[in-house]
Amino acid sequence: MSVKHFIQITKPGIIFGNVLSVAGGFFLASKGHVDFALFLAVVIGTSLVVASGCVFNNCIDRDIDHKMERTKNRVMVQGGMSLPLALIYATLLGVAGFSLLYVQANPLSAFCALIGFIVYVGFYSLWLKRKSVHGTLVGSLSGAMPPVIGYCAVSNSFDLAAVTLLVMFSLWQMPHSFAIAIFRFKDYSAANIPVLPVARGILAAKKQIVLYVLAFVLATLMLTLGGYAGLGYLAVAAAMGLYWLYMAWGGYKAEDDSKWARKVFGFSILTVTALSVMMGVDSQTAADVLMTYAR
């Protein structure tokens, strides 16, 4: 056991991705008036909560991770950390993260983090991931919480913008996850995990990807139409979203489903990154947007 194991078991890649969306939500609510001390507290607090959830997930999935090529070398599978130590580590990370959000931000942001944590660890990892094809849908709510946490940490209000962020990022999670399930089809099949491509076929997953990307594109526009983001954000959201939709539609003609799914997955990351950046740098008040339309 080494320091590397303590880092690896938290899934740093997932933490980094969540930090980007937390920042997007935070800067969207800040509207150019950034409290960097608060920002640091929110980023660290959310990262600790996400890390805690990932460690608990490693503990829960240790019996199936050895069956999957992409997870067979995880710390718990290789015996790099004992189960009791991992559980203690996960608990300490969670307590530290929730406490930081509650004390340095506000109870609302800590509550949002708690909801995301319960959904991911309790409903998804412990139950639905292995039992239902709808596990991905339920799990998407946890993946959508980080930008909401960032937004609520500043606004201290669960308003229309927070709802829009929750819907946007939940919808984004679905095609992103289905694409992974397609190019990792053999892994999920070997572990008997009923993701959509395994349970109902790749064609069914392709149809769902197109529908969810379309819904995502429409949802992204609501930040500007609702008066929370500017026209620069709108232009980027529309361009990225429509191209992602074009890629998704191309799945019906794809000769290599795995190759196509990897492209859809890769562009999904570019899309959510671009939107997180733009909603942070091009946030506006409703009055600003209305004045723009009036000119």
UniProtKB/Swiss-Prot annotation:
One of its GO terms (cellular component) is plasma membrane. Residues 29-37, 98-107, 217-228, 288-295 are periplasmic. The chain crosses the membrane at residues 10-28, 38-56, 79-97, 108-126, 198-216, 229-247, 269-287. Converts protoheme IX and farnesyl diphosphate to heme O. Its main location: membrane. It comes from the Bacteria. This is Protoheme IX farnesyltransferase.
